[in-house]
Amino acid sequence: MLKIGFGYDVHPFAENRRLILGGVVINHPKGYGLLGHSDGDVFFHALIDSLLGMCGLGSIGEYFPESKEFENISSSILLEKTIDLINKRYIVKINNIDVVIISKSVNISSITGQIKNNTSCILNLEVSRINLKGKSGNGLGVGGNDQGIEVYCTILGEIDEI
């Protein structure tokens, strides 16, 4: 069955935190990172929600609550755990992933390839099926007002129950 998944996440900037997008550590112009219970990788969090949504399995918080077990955990591990969870119930073939990253101060153009490669490796998916685009937000919203980063993710895939 052809299904679509949609994910969204937002994290505020914070001092004394790392800034990670799609497993890539970035230097923010003001030295900020992203606040979060895990490593705060807002890209992987939106991707996880999109995958779960495509499979009708709820949201990231249902599987990875704010507990000691997941405190400061790498979001790439959370993504791997999500794939394992999905693969126990479904055979999934992802057609494509499309992602919008909104931030006034973080330009993703130099790291798009790295994010796509990281995502491709974890999902075992061709890089050509992953599209990323950065937007400034034009002074609107959390990303546009430079309070944090917002990510929207859409996935189209074929899903069959095991």
UniProtKB/Swiss-Prot annotation:
It is an enzyme of class 4 (lyase). One of its GO terms (biological process) is isopentenyl diphosphate biosynthetic process, methylerythritol 4-phosphate pathway. A divalent metal cation binds at D9, H11, H45. GO terms for molecular function: 2-C-methyl-D-erythritol 2,4-cyclodiphosphate synthase activity; metal ion binding. Pathway: Isoprenoid biosynthesis; isopentenyl diphosphate biosynthesis via DXP pathway; isopentenyl diphosphate from 1-deoxy-D-xylulose 5-phosphate: step 4/6. 4-CDP-2-C-methyl-D-erythritol 2-phosphate binds at D9, V10, H11, H37, S38. InterPro entries: MECDP_synthase (IPR003526), MECDP_synthase_sf (IPR036571). Its cofactor is a divalent metal cation. Its EC number is 4.6.1.12. Binds 1 divalent metal cation per subunit. Gene3D superfamilies: 2-C-methyl-D-erythritol 2,4-cyclodiphosphate synthase. The record marks H37, S136 as: Transition state stabilizer. Keywords: Isoprene biosynthesis, Lyase, Metal-binding. Homotrimer. Belongs to the IspF family. NCBIfam families: ispF. This is 2-C-methyl-D-erythritol 2,4-cyclodiphosphate synthase. The lineage of its organism: Bacteria, Thermotogati, Thermotogota, Thermotogae, Petrotogales.
